[in-house]
Amino acid sequence: MAKYTKEDIINLVKENGVKFIRLQFTDIFGTLKNVAITDKQLEKALDNECMFDGSSIDGFVRIEESDMNLRPNLDSFVIFPWRPQQGKVARLICDVYKPDGTPFEGDPRHVLKRANADAKELGYTMNVGPECEFFLFETDENGRATTNTQDKAGYFDLAPTDLGENARRDMTLALEEMGFEIEASHHEVAEGQNEIDFKYGDALTTADNIMTFKLVVKSIAQRHGLHASFMPKPIFGINGSGMHVNMSLFKDGKNAFVDENDKNGLSKVAYQFIAGLLKNIKGMAAVTNPLVNSYKRLVPGYEAPVYLAWSCKNRTALIRVPAARGAGTRVELRCPDPSSNPYLVLACLLQAGLDGIKNNLQPPAEVEANIFAMTEQERKENGIDNLPNNLYEAVNYMKENELAKKALGDHVYGNYVAGKAAEWDDYRTKVHDWELENYLNKY
């Protein structure tokens, strides 16, 4: 049941003195976009009459077919708590439509809605709980980000060593005021690294929340004179930032991953879901780990998952099944990072899990040993493959994965692969500091 009507939104804007409304949407590479309107244009926007030029957005459309229409999701209305009390700013998350009234196939939100519809046909809905890590960096005198962390704290440390505590507290308060249910907020393993966990929700709500979360974290950090970065590996030699994704399927109001008679407490559906993820993850890594930099995080030795295996306890495996059982039974995929587009990530992961269910796939045996300590020969003997080593490999695996194409649709798939291939080529042809340090004086 909808929380707000059109009239509710108009009244809330008037009663709260809102003067500006951001109509937000996301491009295929996960960048948040918005069209800002004044309160005078609100009714027009709520009547789905707000147009924008889609040819200016990465991966959307060509200039000759550029007209796009924004349709606000009324229940996403929220007032930004950190903006001025005079002339407040609110936002509405929008779906992108074509002028003929059909959903735009290049809208990441639409991609996830299609995946949800496929799950619904089988009687399932997916709940998701993300764990978003980020760094807080100092800025220079011009306000530009540095890689100087403002503390030397470690996992679960607190003030005075955790100098990000005040910023993290204000982020938490702002998120709660915007309707988030915050479950935990703490310093992470690396210096300057933080994590704020919020309650799980259905896949679409969670993807919306991840985009909102990143906006709030960056905005509040800026007010503290800091820069919040969701770059996966900004500093060599310390842990990078991940976005572990916890997933469960529900059917008829019950967790479909539960079987109390199984030795692990897992149902046949849970094992099939795990098998589908393991089968397809290499072909979807360019989505879950979309940057050149993403693969600097995915190396052994920094708690990041590299090897394709699953376990109930073993954190060196790509997929872990946390200890909670009953309604809390879930599967945790540990490779995604927070630079990814959450709509595309969840669409791909859901379709991969459904692929396992539809085709009755079975996962390999659980791996309980420390995979990082295994030799290459031992991993080979145990049938343990690894994720792509870089974005180039990930893009090539994606080109071979039919399910990734199905999950994203032709439009997003084609533009995404082309964009990531170009990104790798741009990186490949640049001269980097490492080359200068090692070669300039030597040769």
Swiss-Prot record:
Q: Name one GO molecular function term.
A: metal ion binding
Q: Give me the residues that bind Mg(2+) 1, please.
A: 131, 244, 332
Q: List the disulfide bonds.
A: none
The protein's required cofactor(s) are namely: Mg(2+)
Does the keyword field hold Metal-binding? Answer: yes
- Spell out the Pfam families in the cross-references: Gln-synt_C, Gln-synt_N
Q: Which residues bind ATP?
A: 183, 248, 315, 320
Q: Give the Enzyme Commission number.
A: 6.3.1.2
* Protein name per its UniProtKB record: Glutamine synthetase
Which lineage do the record's taxonomy fields give for this organism?
A: Bacteria, Bacillati, Bacillota, Clostridia, Eubacteriales
